[in-house]
Regions:
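Solvent-exposed alpha-helical segments and adjacent loops
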Residues: 1-605
Length: 605
């Protein structure tokens, strides 16, 4: 995290242990790297829950940038720990000149971390979900019943949503480290947390109610017991969202800026939080600030950016409030988006030395947010996944052995979704069949090319090539002896459909592709583009993934030995246009001659 300006601020909040904190063993370790041109007497303050915990000189940080700050005992009932980093940076006695250099910088390193030791180990079910793990394992028994298989799919999807930054493995046997075990449906209690020498264990009965309870109750106070028997739980709430999302609902609570120069507030949101790609979108801004005295020559300017594109500017000199609604062009929207509010405070030359009143500005989270009306129809591009996966869904398995591949894929989508995806699981018939979406709003198919017949971008029934239509160069040729994993996205009867399959004789490549998407360390799921993904085994532990745009504006698919009039028309399109233009010119000339020719004078008799 790069902090810029004379007096920036960084706040990081984490949940406190439920049973209290051991102050003798708990600390936060920070790597603070100042700009080399800063005045040695510049300082960095560290506060914990708004109480001063340490002051560090830039001179000392240059010698040792890593500092360890003890976390004191928390007051009763305190649920969160907030660490604030507040630098006070300068280069000279002229703050205006310092700001103009752009060198008032402090970097908070990526290797900074919290070490939180609970006073008493938290053995509640909620305690398992509150911890941060380097890796989780879902242990699933072999030979599952259809009901247990669906429960395993749901549980993996839910864990991926609750632990979006944690790799989650699928295994059929216990392993060391933190793990979640799917128990038989008659296991009691339905939810149980155990702490063993090998690590934390969460045992979950293979019941619909148990998995729904994990999601619906963990964020409340319902899972504060070591073992829980679930009597009943409501279905996952699917209430229609009002077409407004406040900044508080985005997890941003009344952000505050205080300092000089150029400062920014960044609000991150994704299409899933909006429920899809809106037809129109606007940002409602409610900002309060201390007035900047324009009579003295001070200036305050505000800017609004969406994904790096400047949309609006405001002259805020002398104002104490900004209450505006800014239209956000939907053409600029991506899967993940950034709305940035930037404020430039320029002091007059006469006010640059000595005591200078900083700008203090705050955004009201409840009255600020995003507004939209209606949604665009799906367009068949992976950029809109998983935002368009709304309502009830279905996962169709060609074989029960493909369940891990399906779980990895659904889990990858749940990591990016506003709510976990809990689709119905069905096993497809062995014979080839045409699939219909039925009453489902979307579906995921995991099956071989000889088992389903779908109007997908690539027909897998025969050899195919992906070609560049501009130069006819072959970008990918699927030879009979090769093995590929494929993920294709298209619309079936207007409904989003994902088909995970393979080319060749190795179905394991489909699982390798979905496992790569599910691993948050690869960030593959965040970068989905086009409408087709291909994967091949570049090495035993390396899967090479490539995305393709096979829409009419992108690459083309050619099937050797099969005539394609579309490719023929595209290949000779310029000659066809030239011939058509010549024919039109000849026709126009003939018409002109007939209409413009002079009539012959009659011969007198």
């Amino acid at each position: 995290m790069l902090l810029q300006g004379a007096n920036p601020r960084l706040d990081v909040t984490v949940p406190a242990p439920l049973n209290g904190l051991d102050p003798e063993a708990s600390f936060v370790q920070l790597r603070l790297e100042p700009s080399p041109v800063l005045k040695p007497t510049s300082t960095v303050r560290v506060l914990i829950n708004d109480e001063l915990a340490g002051i560090f000189l830039v001179r000392d940080l240059r010698q040792e940038p890593v500092v360890r700050v003890p976390i004191p005992a928390l007051p009763p009932g305190e649920r969160f720990i907030t660490v604030s980093v507040q630098p006070f940076l300068s280069i000279s006695d002229d703050i205006c000149a310092d700001l103009n250099t752009g060198n008032l910088l402090l970097t908070v390193g990526r290797d900074s971390f919290f070490e939180l030791v609970p006073r008493v180990p938290d053995t509640t079910v909620a305690g398992f979900l509150r911890l941060v793990y380097p890796q989780l394992t879902l242990v699933v028994p072999a030979n599952l019943t259809p009901e247990a298989a669906e429960a395993a799919l749901w549980l993996y999807s839910l864990l991926s949503h609750l632990f979006p930054q944690t790799p989650i493995l699928w295994s059929n046997r216990p392993v060391a480290g933190a793990q979640v075990t799917l128990e038989p449906a008659n296991f009691t209690p339905h939810l149980q947390h155990e702490i063993t020498p090998e690590g934390s264990r969460l045992r979950v009965a293979a019941r619909r109610e148990s998995i729904l309870a994990l999601y619906e109750e963990w964020k409340r106070a319902g899972l504060v017991s070591r073992g829980i028997q679930v009597a009943a739980v409501a279905d996952l709430e699917r209430a229609l969202r009002a077409n407004r999302l406040s900044f508080r609902e985005l997890g941003i609570v009344d952000p505050l800026l205080r300092g000089f120069g150029s400062q920014s507030l960044v609000f991150n949101f994704n299409l899933s939080q909006l429920g899809g790609r809106p037809r129109d979108l606007a940002a409602q801004l409610d900002v309060i600030m201390n007035p900047v005295d324009g009579r003295a020559g001070d200036r305050l300017t505000g800017y609004v950016f969406l994904n790096g594109v400047l949309l609006r500017t405001y002259n805020l000199t002398g104002r104490t409030q900004l209450n505006e609604t800014v239209t956000l062009p939907t053409r600029l929207l991506r899967r993940f988006n950034q709305l940035e509010l930037r404020f430039d405070y320029g002091a007059s030359l006469g006010n640059c030395q000595g005591s200078l009143t900083p700008l203090t500005l705050q955004v009201r989270s409840d009255s600020s947010g995003l507004l939209w009306s209606g949604y665009q129809a799906p367009n068949g591009e992976l950029q809109e996944i998983p935002a368009v996966l709304q309502g009830s869904g279905r996962v169709g398995l060609g074989d029960p052995q493909l369940l891990p591949a399906a779980a990895y894929l659904v889990g990858a989508l749940s990591r990016l979704a506003a709510r976990p995806l809990l689709p119905t699981l069905e096993v497809l018939p062995k014979e080839e069949a045409n699939l219909e979406t039925g009453n489902f709003a979307w579906q995921v198919i995991v099956a071989g090319p000889d088992q389903v017949e779908l109007n997908s971008p690539i027909r897998l029934g025969s050899q195919f090539e992906i070609i560049n239509p501009l130069n006819q160069q072959v970008a990918l040729a699927a030879q009979p002896q090769e093995n590929l994993g494929l993920l294709q996205y298209f619309l079936l009867q207007g409904k989003p459909t994902l088909w995970l399959s393979w080319w060749g004789s190795d179905p394991a490549l489909a699982e390798r592709l979905s496992r790569g998407l599910a691993d948050p360390r690869t960030r593959l799921a965040n970068q989905l583009q086009g409408n087709v993904l291909t994967a091949y085994a570049a090495a035993p532990n390396l899967t090479q993934v490539q995305s393709w745009d096979l829409t009419p504006q992108g690459y083309r698919v050619r099937y050797p030995g099969r005539f394609s009039w579309q490719l023929l028309l595209w290949q000779y399109r310029y000659w066809l246009v030239l011939v058509l233009a010549l024919l039109l010119a000849v026709g126009a000339w003939n018409v002109y001659q007939r209409l413009a020719g002079r009539p012959e004078s009659p011969i007198p008799s």
